[in-house]
């Protein structure tokens, strides 16, 4: 009998030991905890730093500068060394958490996001949103060993070492992709409806073949707030051979009529019994019991009222604590996992934003009053971190492809139809059917394009300041200068024959200016949508960053840049390209993908272009 008890204890100890060893870095997050449970690391996107926290003392040991917009972070195996994906600088930075120092950096092609490491600390896997790969990096030499194709715009990543697999989420489809590490090939895929979107992360169950993915659904034919953007956690059965291998759990009805918005991350406890999800739009978290029933999957336990814009959640390796990062409070909150009462709070960094910009960013991400009446949606639901959501919406004025906010300060007026000349005009959207909020201005809203709404509300002006703050990063296709093909494409683009540069001119490659009358153009696409109300002339969009912003045109019908130049260039209204041969079209595309190949703002200032900051 005593032998059986000892054997059982040994098996239990081995299981818990294995959970502890693999808890650091199993799935991507802005947070990670060292395998020995002594250190917490937090990636601070706005600050460009990583904060190292002593777990027992609840105090900051180091704040380490790493670069622009750090995202995923992972401890390396059992060590206190770290790797962080620096999204806007296109590199992984290696850190010593004990010393608070940078060790090295590894350049990558573009936009690293999620990071996981194997238990031995010898291999690092990093998703690259563009061009859609996972970089496998030797953690000793810090050299890229191979680039593994992993679907379209991958962000989330989780490692299943036992089965030699990576699981990756496609950001704009919320699909889960399985990659076999031996062959480096995609071997399976769990696809949801076409409306599923913005899947940044996934987490694996520690003992069962399940993956949990927080995401939204973008219902593009609905322009009322209560049905247009919906929050979900999808559960994938990784072993099932049945047709239905993915269940989607609605989070807006998980707790009766208590609506949440913008799911960001989830975490599962080391024993696999508890799942916590955070919602960055409503500043809430859900604690759920994980069920072993292959039916309901999750059972509600409690709501957590969180700080501004919670973006990360992680359990300690022993499962006794849960950590939540409130990105716009710049703090980490510690919860006891028995009761989920707060144990403590740590300020991870100071805000690098001005008070006005911080206020504007909080409003931009908020799905609460006064911005939103019914909690489902925020500005960030369609423009997360200033990016487009990859969707074409059936708006009241017609089909509208979501536009980037990058460079917007230099490219007013706003919208495809130039129907707004200042961000403050979005008070109409805040009060309208989409957001149904109380609004930020007292009294009636001035008509768009009429008397300015700027200067009427400090909150509304702050929203404008944040919205106009997004800046382009340089294209990875021109890191070493324009290629020979791009140089040929540039000559074609600027030629009098193609006439591309007549409208796509200047440092931002647009003739859009805030001075009236606005310059709108009929490029032959206005008759392709029977629901169009404001066409057929449209404002010229900037071409910067176009390499990663498909689909294209106001109606989003062009899937590629080649289609913009050929299939959708009717009667050569959108520049003259019908005479170009396939090689010339390819050269032109290479030039477009290289934009921007230099910083646009110095040239814009030299040309005395108008910058709208508020």
Stretch-by-stretch model annotation:
Residues 23-49:
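Beta-strand-rich domains and repeat architectures in extracellular enzymes and scaffolds
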Residues 24, 160, 174, 198-225, ...:
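Periplasmic c-type cytochrome electron-transfer domains
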Residues 36-38, 78-80, 120-122, 162-164, ...:
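Short coil/turn segments that connect the beta-strands within blades of beta-propeller domains
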Residues 59-64, 101-106, 143-148, 185-191, ...:
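A short beta-strand motif characteristic of beta-propeller blades
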């Amino acid at each position: 009998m005593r032998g059986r008890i000892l054997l059982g204890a040994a098996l239990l100890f081995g299981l818990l030991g294995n959970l502890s060893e693999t808890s650091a870095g199993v799935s991507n997050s802005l947070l990670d905890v060292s395998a020995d449970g002594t250190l917490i690391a937090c990636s601070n996107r706005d600050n460009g730093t990583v904060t190292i926290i002593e777990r027992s003392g609840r105090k900051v040991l180091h704040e380490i500068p790493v670069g622009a917009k750090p995202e995923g972070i992972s401890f390396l195996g059992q060590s206190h060394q770290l790797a962080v994906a620096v999204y806007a600088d296109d590199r992984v930075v290696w850190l010593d958490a004990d010393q608070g120092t940078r060790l090295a950096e590894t350049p990558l092609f573009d936009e690293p996001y999620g990071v996981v490491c194997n238990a031995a600390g010898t291999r690092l896997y990093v998703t690259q949103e563009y061009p859609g790969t996972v970089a496998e990096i030797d953690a000793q030499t810090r050299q890229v060993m191979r680039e593994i194709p992993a679907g379209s715009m991958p962000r989330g990543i989780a490692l299943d070492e036992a089965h030699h697999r990576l699981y990756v989420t496609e950001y704009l489809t919320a699909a889960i992709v399985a990659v076999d590490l031996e062959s480096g090939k995609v071997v399976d895929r769990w696809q949801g409806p076409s409306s599923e979107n913005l899947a940044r992360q996934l987490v694996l169950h520690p003992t069962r073949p399940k993956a949990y993915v927080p995401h939204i659904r973008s219902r593009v034919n609905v322009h009322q707030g209560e049905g247009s953007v919906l929050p979900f956690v999808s559960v994938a059965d990784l072993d099932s051979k049945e047709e239905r291998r993915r269940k989607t759990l609605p989070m807006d009805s998980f707790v009766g009529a208590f609506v949440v918005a913008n799911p960001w991350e989830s975490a599962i406890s080391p024993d696999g019994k508890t799942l916590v999800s955070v919602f960055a739009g409503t500043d809430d978290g859900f604690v759920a019991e994980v069920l072993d029933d292959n039916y309901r999957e999750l059972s509600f336990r409690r709501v957590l009222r969180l700080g501004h814009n919670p973006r990360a959640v992680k359990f300690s390796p022993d499962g006794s604590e849960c950590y939540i990062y409130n990105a716009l409070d710049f703090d980490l909150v510690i919860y006891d996992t028995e009761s989920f009462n707060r144990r403590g709070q740590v300020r991870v960094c100071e805000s690098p934003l001005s008070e006005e910009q911080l206020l504007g960013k909080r409003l931009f991400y908020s799905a609460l009053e006064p911005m939103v009446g019914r909690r489902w949606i925020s500005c960030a639901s369609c423009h997360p971190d200033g990016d487009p959501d990859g969707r074409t919406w059936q708006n009241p004025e017609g089909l509208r492809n979501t536009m980037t906010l990058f460079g917007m300060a230099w490219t007013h007026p706003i919208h495809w139809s130039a129907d707004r000349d200042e961000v403050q005009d979005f008070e109409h959207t805040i009060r309208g059917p989409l957001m149904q909020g109380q609004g930020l201005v007292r009294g009636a809203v001035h008509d768009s394009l009429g008397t300015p709404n700027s200067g009427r509300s400090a909150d509304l002006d702050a929203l404008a300041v944040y919205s106009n703050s997004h800046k382009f990063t340089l294209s990875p296709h021109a890191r070493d200068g324009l290629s020979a093909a791009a140089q040929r494409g540039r000559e074609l683009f600027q030629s009098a024959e193609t006439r591309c540069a007549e409208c796509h001119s200047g440092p931002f490659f647009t003739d859009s200016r805030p001075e009236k009358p606005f310059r709108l153009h009929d490029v032959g696409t206005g008759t392709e949508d029977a629901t169009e109300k404001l066409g057929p002339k449209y404002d010229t969009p900037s071409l910067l960053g176009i390499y990663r912003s498909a689909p294209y045109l106001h109606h989003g019908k062009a899937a590629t840049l080649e289609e913009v130049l050929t299939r959708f260039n009717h009667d050569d209204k959108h520049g003259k390209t019908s005479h170009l041969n396939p090689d010339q079209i390819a050269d032109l595309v290479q030039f477009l993908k290289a934009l921007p190949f230099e910083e646009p703002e110095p040239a814009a200032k030299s040309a005395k272009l108008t910058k709208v900051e508020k």
